[in-house]
């Protein structure tokens, strides 16, 4: 069964500011079919320590911050920032 995917305005705004090559890689993950079928994407999604439902996906020097609700089968893309900033602003 496919998971529901949501995107925050902040995520979309931050994604539009990324370098072109990084943005293309983020778009492949965020808008691709793989995340709908398996949000844990065979090891690419890593749990944030100290948080039950928050995860990160590493893309070079950038990180995507996501919230996964297993009960509702919902994946919410919340932030995409450089690795030095993501842990200050997410979750």
Model features per residue range: what roles?
Residues 32-57:
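A short, surface-exposed loop/turn module that caps and links secondary-structure elements
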Residues 2, 16, 59-62, 67-91:
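Enriched for short, Lys/Arg-rich terminal
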Residues 8-10, 51, 78-83:
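Generic beta-structure capping elements
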Residues 13, 35-36, 40-43, 81, ...:
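Residue-level signal for pocket-adjacent positions within structured domains
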Residues 1-30:
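Arg/Lys-rich, positively charged N-terminal/basic patches that mediate binding to nucleic acids
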């Amino acid at each position: 069964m496919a998971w529901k995917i949501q995107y925050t305005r902040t995520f979309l705004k931050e994604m539009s500011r990324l370098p072109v090559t990084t943005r293309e890689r983020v778009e492949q993950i965020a808008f691709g079919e793989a995340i709908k079928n398996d949000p844990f994407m065979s090891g690419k999604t890593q749990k944030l320590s100290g948080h039950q439902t928050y995860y990160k996906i590493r893309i070079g020097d950038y990180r995507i911050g996501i919230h996964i609700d297993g009960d509702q089968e919902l994946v919410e893309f919340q932030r995409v920032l450089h690795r030095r900033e993501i842990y200050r602003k997410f979750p």
